[in-house]
């Protein structure tokens, strides 16, 4: 991971294939109603992990659980852009909750107009919840046919590595504990937690260094 003077990062992948891409269906647990499965497109970039991941998504949905999908697109891991688009399309159709970066929304929707892009993705894939993270500019949320902006939590950012993962961790912790919100107002505490986790993760160098513990979060509220 290389950082610029704003704490933004670029990635170089040194090991290919990595161990996680050898996941097979026999490795999957039995899923149950109420559980969550979180997936990124890196798991879809090669076999056997690709088939295993899609099988896991189908399995947990059949069991009454939900799927969270963060494309987390890393172009260096994909030799074939058509295959990337096909995998994204299939995964997005299976996801209950979708978290995109602004750049990923533009890529998937083929539009620089964020409002149009959100409407396009929502219409095509119909997720229960669509979130577009914009760093310091906050989060755009499409939920129950409504569209709202949530301000970011200001911090002194040192390293943005892992911020998206921390955001999703906070998001899923809240959704798993409390269930899907009933309306946009009820969604706000969930996104406050997610944004706090993401913001705190940027306050030290390293992907894991500043990931907050519950005690850290307790001091924020």
Swiss-Prot record:
EC assignment: 2.7.1.4
Superkingdom classification of source: Bacteria
PROSITE patterns recorded: PFKB_KINASES_2
One family name in Pfam for this protein: PfkB
GO molecular function, one term: fructokinase activity
Record keywords: ATP-binding, Carbohydrate metabolism, Kinase, Nucleotide-binding, Plasmid, Transferase
Catalysed reactions, as listed in the record: D-fructose + ATP = D-fructose 6-phosphate + ADP + H(+)
NCBIfam families: PRK09434.1
Protein family per UniProt: Belongs to the carbohydrate kinase PfkB family.
Name assigned to this protein: Fructokinase
């Amino acid at each position: 991971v290389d950082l610029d003077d704003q704490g933004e990062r670029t990635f170089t992948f040194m090991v290919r294939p990595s161990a996680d891409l050898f996941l097979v269906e026999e490795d999957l647990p039995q899923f149950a109603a109420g559980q969550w499965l979180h997936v990124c497109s890196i798991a879809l970039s090669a076999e056997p992990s690709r088939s295993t991941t899609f099988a896991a998504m189908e399995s947990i949905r059949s069991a009454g659980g939900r799927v969270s999908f963060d494309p987390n697109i890393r172009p260096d891991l994909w030799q074939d852009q058509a295959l990337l688009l096909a995998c994204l399309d299939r995964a997005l159709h299976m996801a209950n909750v979708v978290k995109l970066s602004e750049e990923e929304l533009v890529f998937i929707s083929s539009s620089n107009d964020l409002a149009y892009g959100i409407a396009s993705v929502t219409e095509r894939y119909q997720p229960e919840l669509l979130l577009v993270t914009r760093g310091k500019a906050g989060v755009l949320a499409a939920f129950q046919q409504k569209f709202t902006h949530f301000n970011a939590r200001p911090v002194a950012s040192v390293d943005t590595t892992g911020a998206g993962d921390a955001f999703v961790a906070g998001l899923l912790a809240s959704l798993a504990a409390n269930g899907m919100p009933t309306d946009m107002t009820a969604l706000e505490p969930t996104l406050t937690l997610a944004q706090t986790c993401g913001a705190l993760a940027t306050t030290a160098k390293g992907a894991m260094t500043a990931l907050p513990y519950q005690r850290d979060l307790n001091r924020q509220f």
